[in-house]
């Protein structure tokens, strides 16, 4: 297992991991990253200042990723934990938690004081992991992610 920064050639494989995972959980619906055109151009998206994306590989095959993004209209000092998805074979290995911890560390090292995320009931297992690492439920969304299909919003202080 290796975790590394996103590279220009990663877009297609990452989009496939993300969309396959969403479909497996029945979360491939409008208003989610499944239909978000930026899912096909993650390398370009994560060239945005204040953002970073980590890619996980097993035997040089991309099996997931996770990132930090300065989503529009979030409160001062807040970033969003985004696009944490794993291929089926990488789930249950601790890799998701590792990706999340590395991303949260990057956020803190880069001056963020809070991390926001959006999810949905179909991804209940992920939501329970977020709670275990200190994310707290909110009763409304923050910022403007454009993902109206997400109705679980959480925030963590770093």
Segments (PLM) and residue ranges:
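Extreme N-terminal starter segment of soluble prokaryotic enzymes
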Residues: 1-3
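Acetyl-CoA-dependent GNAT
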Residues: 5-89, 100-102, 141-143, 157-158
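Active-site acidic-Proline motif in GNAT/NAT acetyltransferases
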Residues: 87-89, 93, 121-122
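Conserved phosphate-binding and hydrolysis motifs of nucleotide-dependent enzymes
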Residues: 60, 64, 94-96, 134
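C-terminal "cap" of GNAT-fold acetyltransferases
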Residues: 20, 113-116, 120-158
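Residues that form or flank phosphate/diphosphate-binding pockets in enzymes
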Residues: 76, 94, 125
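Conserved acyl-CoA
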Residues: 98-114
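Conserved amphipathic alpha-helical interaction elements at protein-protein interfaces in regulatory
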Residues: 20, 24, 92, 105-109, ...
């Amino acid at each position: 297992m290796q975790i590394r920064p996103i590279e220009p050639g990663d877009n297609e494989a990452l989009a496939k991991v993300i969309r396959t995972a969403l479909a497996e959980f029945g979360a491939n619906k409008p208003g989610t990253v499944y239909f978000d055109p930026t899912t096909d151009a993650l390398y370009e998206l994560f060239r945005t200042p204040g953002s970073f994306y980590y890619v996980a590989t097993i035997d040089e095959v991309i099996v997931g990723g996770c990132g930090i993004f300065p989503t529009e209209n979030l409160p001062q000092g807040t970033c969003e934990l985004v696009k944490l998805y794993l291929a089926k074979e990488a789930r249950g290995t601790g890799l998701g938690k590792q990706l999340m911890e590395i991303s949260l560390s990057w956020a803190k090292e880069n001056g963020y004081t809070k991390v926001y995320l959006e999810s949905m009931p179909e991804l209940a297992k992920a939501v329970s992991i977020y709670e275990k690492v200190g994310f707290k439920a909110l009763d409304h969304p923050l910022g403007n992610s454009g993902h109206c299909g997400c109705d679980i919003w959480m925030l963590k202080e770093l």
